Amino acid sequence: MAGTVRTACLVVAMLLSLDFPGQAQPPPPPPDATCHQVRSFFQRLQPGLKWVPETPVPGSDLQVCLPKGPTCCSRKMEEKYQLTARLNMEQLLQSASMELKFLIIQNAAVFQEAFEIVVRHAKNYTNAMFKNNYPSLTPQAFEFVGEFFTDVSLYILGSDINVDDMVNELFDSLFPVIYTQLMNPGLPDSALDINECLRGARRDLKVFGNFPKLIMTQVSKSLQVTRIFLQALNLGIEVINTTDHLKFSKDCGRMLTRMWYCSYCQGLMMVKPCGGYCNVVMQGCMAGVVEIDKYWREYILSLEELVNGMYRIYDMENVLLGLFSTIHDSIQYVQKNAGKLTTTIGKLCAHSQQRQYRSAYYPEDLFIDKKVLKVAHVEHEETLSSRRRELIQKLKSFISFYSALPGYICSHSPVAENDTLCWNGQELVERYSQKAARNGMKNQFNLHELKMKGPEPVVSQIIDKLKHINQLLRTMSMPKGRVLDKNLDEEGFESGDCGDDEDECIGGSGDGMIKVKNQLRFLAELAYDLDVDDAPGNSQQATPKDNEISTFHNLGNVHSPLKLLTSMAISVVCFFFLVH
């Protein structure tokens, strides 16, 4: 509510700063025979009075404010009025989009940071699983897990990384360590040069079963949707920025000058433009911008459809926060088949004669330390899912933003709304009778100064980008009804699995399944017994990719909700500095 009030105040302040004619309310006085009032007003726009005649002149050199008699305007004054009118128009357009722009910028920043926090929590879960269940695999497992989740973060931010390659690299790296530390802990040092053979055997023999394929499918689907969601928000910002900084044509500038300032030349300082006339001028000036409307509407509706489908395997929270359990199940699968795998790999890699096989026993009670998964209780919890839905509802209130722009600008500039005793661009009339044109360039009212032509190149480019993102959003949107259920079952979710939107069964089949919160509470942190940054060996395992991701987005310590709130506040302050 406070943000809306601040935004409204800024809009009012901006509008009050514009140099519009007719801001006072008294009825129009008779024309000024000495040009004194014209000189006083013009001095606000241009210091000095050398361009303003002291008494009315013929004005034969004027090109916009064509006089029917003596005028108080010169050619230089007319040029200054045109420049001022175009600047006023640009400021009006920016004030119209301020609330929408702030909404998208704020949410894009918040969601990007929140998704990064989800990735860090998922990394913590996974490292905690290794520490509690397979301590002999650390710190090597920490390094591989760190590289994997770094790739996940980079992918979300738009990096050209293949998800299948990410997952394959994780399991390719883990298997040699599992083979030498869990399956054959007594393997002599002379046999440790078989890593490449083990990496190849991992895929050929499917030593982890179908778990890598399952992870590929789930991670790929959830990250693709998340990535498109962020891309769509960033494009929304680009669309608003593009239309915010449009430079209006000279034809438009002449029409604006005629509407807002030409009455001054006749000494009519208090006259307001007719409301209907304003609508005609604005529809003409913004005909190209209004062409965006169709694709903007589709953008919001497509984004809504995508958000409605972001759950289960299409929700990165659900997938990434449960990834540790699937990885654990995959390692258990290897252990259960250790004897067969050791024999086969021993022959394949030609080292079976040099080893004595000694199986490692891991009792069932060492599954997952539930203390690691404690969740801090927060009243009135807000999940990312609810925040996404809230964003969509707010965006839908702007679905007619572009088609409504001409009317918005006229309603926020001084006009005679009842079209009585108003300025029609040429003279003061008792009533304006010309009907306003319909939106769009093809149907606009025929005005001489506004030539019929297509949208500006920059508008055409942004329309093409909207078409592209709309196509991506439609492609990524979830199938509905039974098709959805069938797809989920095929990806490893069987009927009877936990399906609650807030709590999911994280863990594979068997007695080891536990129930944890699978959605982070918005702006709330999970309580961990294990801080990954303090994990043994982890502080020295920084990789080049870790450095790369820090250049994208430096989040600081994941366990500091104050930093998240501070960064959000900084984003808001920076936005308002940019506006001013």
UniProtKB/Swiss-Prot annotation:
> Key word Cell membrane present in the record?
yes
Biological process annotations from GO: anatomical structure morphogenesis; anterior/posterior axis specification; body morphogenesis; bone mineralization; branching involved in ureteric bud morphogenesis; canonical Wnt signaling pathway; cell migration; cell migration involved in gastrulation
- What the entry says about post-translational processing? O-glycosylated; contains heparan sulfate and/or chondroitin sulfate. Cleaved intracellularly by a furin-like convertase to generate 2 subunits, alpha and beta, which remain associated through disulfide bonds and are associated with the cell surface via the GPI-anchor. This processing is essential for its role in inhibition of hedgehog signaling. A second proteolytic event may result in cleavage of the protein on the cell surface, separating it from the GPI-anchor and leading to its shedding from the cell surface.
Q: Which residues are reported to be glycosylated? A: 124, 241, 418, 495, 509
Q: Which cysteines are joined by disulfide bonds?
A: 35-72, 65-262, 73-265, 197-349, 252-285, 274-422, 278-410
- State whether keyword Amino-acid biosynthesis applies: no
Intracellular or extracellular location(s): Cell membrane
Q: Name one GO molecular function term.
A: peptidyl-dipeptidase inhibitor activity
- Positions annotated as pro-peptide in this chain are 555-580
Alphabetic keyword roster: Cell membrane, Disease variant, Disulfide bond, Glycoprotein, GPI-anchor, Heparan sulfate, Lipoprotein, Membrane, Phosphoprotein, Protease inhibitor, Proteoglycan, Pyrrolidone carboxylic acid, Signal
Q: Which residues form the signal peptide?
A: 1-24
Annotated membrane topology: Lipid-anchor; GPI-anchor
Question: What is the stated purpose of this protein?
Answer: Cell surface proteoglycan. Negatively regulates the hedgehog signaling pathway when attached via the GPI-anchor to the cell surface by competing with the hedgehog receptor PTC1 for binding to hedgehog proteins. Binding to the hedgehog protein SHH triggers internalization of the complex by endocytosis and its subsequent lysosomal degradation. Positively regulates the canonical Wnt signaling pathway by binding to the Wnt receptor Frizzled and stimulating the binding of the Frizzled receptor to Wnt ligands. Positively regulates the non-canonical Wnt signaling pathway.
The entry's other comment says:
Used as a marker for hepatocellular carcinoma (HCC) as it is expressed in HCC but is not detectable in hepatocytes from normal or benign liver diseases. When attached to the cell surface, stimulates the growth of HCC cells by increasing canonical Wnt signaling. Cleavage is not required for stimulation of Wnt signaling or HCC growth.
* UniProt-recorded name of the protein: Glypican-3
